[in-house]
Structures are given as structure tokens and as C-alpha cells.
Amino acid sequence: MENVITKQIIVNKKKTYWKNVEQIDKKSALIKDIENKEFANQLPVDKILLDQEGLEADNTTRRDFLKYVGFSTTAAALAACEGPVIKSVPYVVQPEQIRPGIANYYATAIADGFDFASILVKTREGRPIKIESNNDASDFCSANARVHASVLSLYDTKRIQTPKVRGQDSSWDELKSEVLLDLNAVSKKQGKVVLLTQTFASPTTNKIIKDLVTKFPNIEHIILDTVPSSYAVESFKDAYGFEGLVDYDFSKSDFIVSVDADFLGDWQGGGYDTKYVSNRVPDRKNRKGRMSKHVQFESNMTLTGANADIRVPATPTEQKKILSYIYSEVKGLNSKIKLSPEQKENAKFAADGIKKFGSKAVIVSGLDDKNVQDLILDLNNHIRSLAIENSARLTRTQSGNEVDVFIKELLDGKISGLITVGLNPVYSLSEGEKIKKAISDLDFSLSFSMKEDETSSVCKYIAAAPHYLESWGDYEFKEGQYFLAQPTIRPLFNTMQFQDFVLSVIGSSKDYYATIKAFWKQNVLNGRSWNKVLHDGFYKKSKKEKLKFNPKK
């Protein structure tokens, strides 16, 4: 028996592996049962690819199921591997600005209605990761905490990723054709369409909007600033002849009086903090310090009030009385205004300080009242305050009661169409629910928005707007001071800027970038290099004429 086994091993040189002892006996019933259950049938590829019902009805074993999954996964992976063919030529010497791991910085600007600043964007491998102040621009160069955090909204997954028509994803061509049909239909009915925007402070955008209104005369452009300074703008217009705001240089003032003006916060677009702190440097040891005196009258605690030397709590009504008392004292008028002993003492201190420091003093107010703003302008002109800059600030241009008139007409059904750009009036205005219902009843409504907010969600059309770090732009925050915004990354989603869309609607052959470049070469640069200004992010033109204070009687 041993000889037989030995011969068999010698003859069968091919190795045989057994999974269990039962496989030694080829006649075993257990072996036949195992062979029927394991790899018994061929993989039904036709059923996988073509017959879904047959696949579901098939009695599939666990191992066959794993085959199906493996096949489908492999097929999907192979299909995804088919990418576009990109022809590239390698660099002989690799440029420093595209070396992996080394960050690049680009100058751009932000103007979202709240913050206005020239900034530097740090990018790594083509992705913006951090915001810095552009210190080369002496004005509007401060990036506050909100500006620093704005890079996060670029990567927000809740952004609208494509245009929408009646709540459904669409294309830009379809959106454009639908919008043109509705605009023409409303025009034939002589219906009124309101274009509601923030203050753009952009000369090129303002020109594009004028071209749109020329093509569609039934469109009325109304400016809505979420943090308004409407009566300050109106007072400035009455005093200086055009819409704008007084710009203050607090570094030139040794005595500052503020009546509810949070100039270290959002007041008039911010940006006052750098020059304010430059005149508040205590250095008694070397006697080189400069410390201005700051008196703050306000109702709520603000960042400005927290930094004041003297902070006096007062209601808005009391603030108006305090301001009237200061005005009368400085001008030498008889004042019969009644104040509490504490308020009168501090108001007298403020008035005496203004008289003592004269042109080295300044008074500002954030009260949205026409009479208050008239008093402020007249008082600063009376003392010839050096803090009044020669150029007007253009970050707020909403004036008067045009927004109130718009709301009334919208609720009364006198408006046929509405276009909003970067605004959420349903959320920010007081009669939000009524406005929401009125917008949903309009024949035509279009919202340019990054998110499907309270306003855009009830609009007929939603135009997916890009992030400011994906956009081109130009701004004039202050007379003669121009700033450029450039994209620091390719658009992450299927978005389009408001300006590009309007240019396509009015039939322009140029895109927004080409329009900005042409406008600047013709009206701004005066022969300067476009690339140099784009690199720096700003350009300043000297202004020869001074602001002339000539108030209406």
C-alpha cells in the first residue's frame, strides 16, 4: 500500500491543495454540494448592464453579489478616469510664483455694503486661505475681523451653485431668454421695474446700470443700504451739491465729540480706526505720546464708546437735546434746553473743549435725522475743523425717503417687477412678511444672490452670484481714490456677476473685465500702466478743488 501511494505522488508532480479532509474522497456527497454552491454559475453581465428587473428577480448568492459590486465599482472608476487631454509644455526654469508650498499674495478689494477695504489675499496652490490689510493704500486699508472671516464664505457648501428658473436648476442662456421675455412684456404694459441695489461705489458698474436704464426706461434704480446714512447723505448734498459723506481724519483732532456715531464699527462704512488710534499713543516717559480727548454720547454700548475717555449714556431724544446745547454754547446762542445735571455737566465740558481746541476739534453724529446732520456740518464748518477731509466719502449714497416710497408702491401693487442685487429686503426691512407676499405676487422678480435667502426664495428667477474673491470689480470709495478687485480663484460653481449678466442683456460685446479696463484707460489712469495698478490694487488721483460748504437756506 505504501508503494502505491509513493508512486502516485511521484507521478502527480502538480501540487494539489485541499480545503478540508472530505475533498480527499472524490465521491463524497459533501464535495458535490460545495461545488454547486461556490462559483456554480457564470456572472450574468447582460443582466447587470441591461436587465434591471431580471437582476432583481435573480436568486443571487452572496459571492455573486460581491461580483456585481466589484464589477460596477470598477466600471465607474474606469469611466471616471477618462479626463480631458491637456497639452502642456514644461518650464525650463520653474517660476517662483507657482512653486508648491510657497504662498502668493494678490491685491483686491471688498465692498459688500458693510465693509469697504483694499486687501491682500494669501493663496496657496491657487486657493485663497487668508485675508490681510493692504497697508500700501493709506486709506481704506484696514481689514477688520469680519473681512478676515470673509474667506470662509467662499467655501460655503450652501451657496447657490447654478441659476434657477421657477425653483428649478437651469442654465444662463435659459435664464437670460426668460428675463428678456418678462422685461419686454412688462415694458409693453408700461409697468414699473425697480432695480434695488446697495451702494456700489463703482464707476464702471454705475455706467453699466445707466446703459441698462437707457435700454429699458421703465427700470428705476433705487439704492438700499442695509446700514443707512440717508439723512447724512441728504444733508451733505444740500451743503456741498452732490451725494456723498464727509470723510474724517481723526488723527488731526485733539478733541473728539461723538453723538451716537460708532466710527470704530460700521458707521458710514468703517475704516476710521487706523487714523483714530494713531493719535491715541500714550508715551509719558519719552514725551512723544499723543492722546486725543474723546467724549461719547450714546444709548447702547459700542466699540467706540468703550474706547472713549468719557462715555455718557443718553437716549436718542436726550442726545438731540445735548447736541442742541453744544451747538448753542459753541455759537454763543442763548440756550434754554433742559438737561439732567450729569448730562449738562458733560455737554458743557464737550462744548468748552470744542471752543478751546477750535480747528483741532471735531464733532460727529450717527443719528439718522436731517436736522442733526445739518447741525453737525454747520458746527464743523464754524470751527474750521482740520479733520474734515478735502474729498468726499462715497460708500453710502442712499438719500431721502426713496426706499419708503418704494415699499409703499410695492405693497400697493404699483410695481410690476423687481431686481435685487446682493440684498435681502425681506429680512432687513421692517415689513418683511408683507414685502415677501408682494414680491411673490409680482409678474417679474429676479434676485442676484449667493444663497437662497428669504428674498431670493420667493423670486421667480435666481441668478447665482459669485463670491467677491471670484470676481472682478472697481471702486471709488473716496473722491479720487480708486481700487481694483480681481479674482483670486476660478469660480467654484456655475455663477455669473450681475455686471456680466446686464452686459449680455443689453447686447454688449464686452465682458465686465474688458469694460472695466476700457473705462479706466479712458477716465482714470491718465496714461498709467493698467498692470501696475492691478498689481498694487489702488490708484490715487490728485484733487485740486476743495469742498465748498454752501448750504441751502
Residues covered by each model-derived region:
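N-terminal export/assembly segments and adjacent metallocofactor-ligating motifs
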Residues: M1-I337, P341-E342
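A generic alpha-helix preference that emphasizes hydrophobic side chains
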Residues: K27-S28, R62, C141, K192, ...
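Non-catalytic alpha/beta scaffold blocks inside enzyme catalytic domains
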Residues: V186, L224-W530
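Intrinsic low-complexity, intrinsically disordered segments enriched in polar/basic residues
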Residues: I9-K15, D374-L377, N381, K540-K548, ...
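Long, low-complexity segments enriched in small/aliphatic residues
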Residues: W520-K553
